[in-house]
Amino acid sequence: MKNRFLILLSFVLIVGRDVVCANTSMVRERININRDWRYQIDDPDGVGAALHYSRLKPYLLPCANDFIIFGKRYQRPEGNPGENIAYVKSDFDDSEWRHLNLPHDWAIEGPFNIDYNGSTGKLPYWGIRWYRKTLELSQDDAGKQIYLDIDGAMSYVSVWCNGQYVGGWPYGYASFRLDLTPYIKAGQKNVLAIRLDNPDDTSRWYPGSGIYRNVWLVKTSPVHVEQWGTFVRNQQVDSEIAVMEMGVNIENHAGKDVQVKLQTSVRPVGEEVTQSNTKDIAIKKDSWSSARFQFKVDKPKLWDIDTPNCYVAVSRVFMDGKEMDSYETPFGIRTIEFTHNQGFMLNGQKVAIKGVCMHHDLGALGAAFNEVAAERQLRIMKEMG
C-alpha cells in the first residue's frame, strides 16, 4: 500500500508539476521567478495613509472581474496610487535591501515572544513589507500578453510595474493573476515592486506572512486558452468505454474579431495520442468563446487512490495556419457516488473518507511552501488511513 502511495505522490509532485510547467508552445511560457528578490521592512518615511486598504480598494476590486460571471463588474478609477513613493520607482536603488529567494515567510524568522496575542505561534506575522525584482524581457516578447501569477501572499497585496500601479489582492489564502501587459516593456529591464500589509489580530491561528508560495511570469499570444479555462468530466464510464465531455475557453486580446481552429488530442500520460477533435471558433474582439465536445476512451484505465492512472488533453489553438497556443489538461477517469448504506463509492468500491484539521503552514518551517515537507505531510495522512 505504501509503495503504491509513493507512486501516486511521485505523480502529483513530479509529473503533475511538469504538466503545469509544460503548458508551453512557441508562444506560451510559464517561467518561475522565485529567485533574486530584494526585501525591505516597513514603508519609507512619509507614506502615512496613502496606501491604506480603504484607499486602494477601488483599484483592487477590478482584479476579481474574471471570477464574476453574473452581477456587477468593477471599473478601475483613474490615477496611479503610490506613484510618488520611492520604493515603486524603477530607478530606486534597492542594493542595500536584503537579498532572498521565494517562497518566503518573514514571521517564522521571529523573534518568538510569549506575550504576543492569540494562538498564532507567538511570532510577528503582522506588518508591512516590500519585495522588488528586476525582469528583463526580450524584444521577441513584444505583442504578447504578459501575466503575473502569485500562488499565495499574506496579505493585502499591491503590485507596481515600472512605477505604475497594476493591482493586487486582499485575501491571503488565494492565488491570483495580474495582467502586466499595459505596463511591461519588451526588450528592456522591468521592475516589479510588491507591497504586503498584514494586519494584527486578524487570525486565530498561525497565518504566515510574505510571498509564501511560488510566483510565475506567463507569456502568451493575444489569442490563448483562458487561465483555468478547461474542464473534463465523465458522462459514462464502465470497463469497456468512457464517454467524456470537455470544455475549452479561449480569450481574444488581438484587438479585432478572430476565427481560430481548436485542436484537442487525448492520450494516457506518457503514451501516444489516442484520438483528436477539431473545431472552428469565432471570437469577438476583447471577448472569449467556449467550445464543448465529446470524446471516447476505449477500455479506460481508471484513476483510484492506489493506481492513479491519468490522461492528458492537449488543446492547441491555430489562427491563419499559425499555432497561437498549446495548453495541457491532466485528468483522471473515475466514478464517484454517495449511497445511503455504503457511503462514498469510488469506481464502485467503498472508500472511507477521514479528515484532519491541518492548516497550510509546515510547522517549524513556517508557511513558505516546501515540496519535501508537503510530501511528508501527505505520507503521514496516508498512513493514518
How does the language model describe each region?
Residues 1-25:
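Bacterial Sec-dependent N-terminal signal peptides
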Residues 20-114, 191-197:
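Accessory carbohydrate-binding/adhesion or oligomerization-edge regions at the termini
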Residues 28, 229-230, 314-383:
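N-terminal carbohydrate-binding accessory modules
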Residues 31, 42-44, 76, 83, ...:
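Accessory beta-strand-rich segments of carbohydrate-active enzymes
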Residues 161, 241-282, 289-293, 315:
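Beta-strand-rich binding/interaction modules
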Residues 178-183, 293-308:
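Signal that preferentially marks extracellular ectodomain short beta-strand elements
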Residues 218, 282, 330-334:
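Short beta-strand edge segments in extracellular beta-sheet folds
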